[in-house]
Amino acid sequence: MKHLFILFFLLTTNAFAQGPYGDYAVVKDKDGYVNIRAKENVKSKIVGTLPNNTLVYGFFDKEYNPTNWIEVDKGYVHQSRLKKIFDFRAIKGKVQGNSIIFDDKDVKVTITKQKFDKTKHKITKKDQGSYDQLIIDGKEIYGIEIYGGDDSLPEDHYKSITVTMKGKNVPIPKSAYDDLYQISYFSSSIYYDEEAEALYIYADNGEAGLAYEVCWQIVKGEYKTRIIR
């Protein structure tokens, strides 16, 4: 029965992963904030607000979201009040060994990966009833199967992410990337919003049904957040 559940989990996970990707975007409104509506209607009750430069994730493609409204934690915001991160200035990257370096006049980002050495990590399993969930260093993981033995351990992971903005180092906590595995440099990119002094580091890691997107946000020299999908 346990094996049947795992097979079902694999099939459904792959099915969902093959669906449409959304977009990362930030709030950009002349009032400095956007209203969150309870429903997908401008006359719907206001249940909250999001300030400018708040990072969100949603489906902008008309085929999958014809309403022009993006779902957030408490409700919906209108697409016209959002700007996709891919519309900001892109900074080109260059792969050098185990690192990819993005460098221009305002920003320098170095992302380095390394091989996964299981002897340097605490690997445990959490009983989920129908299967055992793989836990690495006490955290749930992205990019690899969440169950299994040594054959499902990752090949690599992030070693470090270093950021310099206008000559000043920006500390990126290890907790912002130490649960992410199966790194792909060729799908990494960064975007810079000069007006807000905001940097967005994007990556599309993993493969097939285990693929995931991540976006880190840094504003005015301070690490703010990440969103994983």
Stretches with model-predicted labels:
Residues E40-K45:
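Short alpha-helix capping/helix-loop boundary micro-motifs
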Residues K108-T110, G143-I144, E197-D204:
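Short beta-strand elements that form the blades of beta-propeller/WD-repeat-like
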Residues Q18-R37:
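Short N-terminal segments immediately surrounding and downstream of signal-peptide cleavage
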Residues P171-V214:
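Acidic, glycine-rich flexible loop segments
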